[in-house]
């Protein structure tokens, strides 16, 4: 089986992550759930109960007994089902790579079984641990990258503009959260480890000579903390401020937070309750009278579904809460501002700035 020794070297971990080749994560579902990589699919050799049993056996009786128990647990029909799943994945993704926790026994066994079916997939040397360490290294060195920041008041369309810019990283998309009290998505956020891995890979895929564009964020996005090296760059990098009138921002928020969820099948009552709970989170800072006003307007809007009524409560929320908060924060960043203006002005300013930085690099 010498040909199976074509597993990647530890030094190739960065290339594996950069290329985004399909990955077969052979760890147990519990291990996978704590954090993996965007290109990974969990097809475990051992499920959680089997892994626990093998681990207990290893501690009590040693490696040989643990291996024997593993072979007993994954035998017969169970083994055939798992080989079928790996083989089907390999057939769909012949360029896939295998990994387990350290690139050891689990991936070696699956590699051997797959070879017997005609699928010769390499395994990642060092396994998950090697890939994870590579991601942490990318984040630790983030301060070496050239970074600029796109800011602007809530609803100004920063994320939309970010999507049109080369070499941008959408932190909110990676965190599956729009970064405010109202920013939760219908699906849960990734684990902190998965978020860090995805962010590191996104940075790795932008050439080191290029400028990375990030959206201005606080220290956390929903429940996820931004890695400290990235947060330091957000606090220090040149800032481009997108300026959009409040009515246009309210219309944008209405489309994203009301129209889009309803179009995705969220019922009106559920959406109203979600927005009401989000409002309750900021009630103390908003104040009782203003909270009551917005709560009443929100209920009235959902009772009649009129766009103008929705725009009323959204504009009040911007006027009374989000705009003053952002303006206060911006006061602390005035010396970093390179340009302010509408989307087209900011796009051109960013292009000029990045071109100038590239020439002086």
Tell me what each language-model feature is.
Residues 1-38, 135-143, 147-151:
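Flexible, polar/low-complexity N-terminal or interdomain linker segments that lie immediately upstream
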Residues 233-239, 243-361:
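Conserved NTP phosphate-binding and transfer environment spanning the P-loop NTPase/kinase superfamily
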Residues 105-106, 146-166:
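Glycine-rich phosphate-binding P-loop
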Residues 70-125:
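Catalytic cysteine-centered active loop of the rhodanese-like fold, especially the PTP/DSP P-loop
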Residues 17-90:
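Positively charged, proline/Ser/Thr-rich regional signature most characteristic
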Residues 111-116, 159-170:
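A conserved segment at the C-terminal end of the G1
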Residues 116-135, 237-243:
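Short, acidic/small-residue loops that bind anionic groups at enzyme active sites
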Residues 166-234:
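Conserved nucleotide-sensing/catalytic segment adjacent to the nucleotide-binding pocket
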């Amino acid at each position: 089986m010498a040909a199976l020794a074509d597993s990647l070297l530890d030094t190739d971990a960065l290339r594996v992550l950069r290329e985004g080749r399909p990955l077969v994560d052979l760890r147990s579902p519990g291990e996978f759930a704590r954090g993996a990589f965007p290109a990974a699919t969990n097809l475990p050799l051992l499920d959680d109960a089997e892994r626990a049993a093998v681990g207990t056996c290893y501690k009590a009786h040693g490696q040989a007994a643990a291996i024997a128990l593993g072979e007993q647990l994954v035998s017969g029909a169970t083994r055939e089902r798992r080989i079928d799943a790996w083989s089907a994945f390999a057939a769909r993704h012949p360029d896939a790579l295998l990994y387990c926790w350290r690139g050891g026994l689990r991936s070696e066994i699956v590699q051997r079984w797959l070879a017997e079916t005609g699928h010769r997939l390499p395994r990642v040397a060092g396994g998950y641990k090697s890939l994870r360490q590579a991601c942490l290294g990318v984040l630790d060195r983030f301060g070496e990258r050239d970074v600029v920041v796109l800011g602007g008041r809530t609803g100004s369309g920063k994320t939309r503009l970010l999507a049109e810019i080369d070499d941008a990283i959408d932190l909110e998309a990676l965190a599956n959260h729009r970064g405010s009290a109202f920013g939760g998505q219908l699906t849960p956020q990734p684990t902190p480890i998965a978020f860090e891995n995805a962010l590191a890979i996104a940075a790795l895929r932008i050439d080191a000579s290029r400028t990375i564009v990030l959206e201005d964020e606080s220290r956390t996005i929903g429940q996820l903390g931004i890695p400290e090296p990235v947060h330091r760059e957000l606090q220090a990098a040149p800032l481009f401020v997108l300026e959009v009138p409040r009515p246009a921002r309210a219309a944008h928020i209405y489309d994203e937070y009301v129209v889009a969820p309803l179009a995705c099948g969220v019922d009106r009552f559920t959406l109203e309750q979600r927005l009401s709970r989000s409002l309750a989170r900021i009630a103390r800072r908003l104040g009782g009278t203003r909270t009551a006003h917005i709560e009443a307007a929100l209920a009235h809007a959902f009772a009649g579904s009129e766009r103008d009524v929705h725009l009323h409560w959204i504009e009040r929320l911007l006027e009374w809460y989000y705009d003053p908060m952002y303006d206060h924060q911006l006061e602390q960043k005035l010396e970093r501002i390179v340009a302010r203006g509408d989307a087209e002005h900011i796009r051109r300013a960013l292009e000029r700035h990045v071109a100038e930085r590239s020439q002086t690099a």
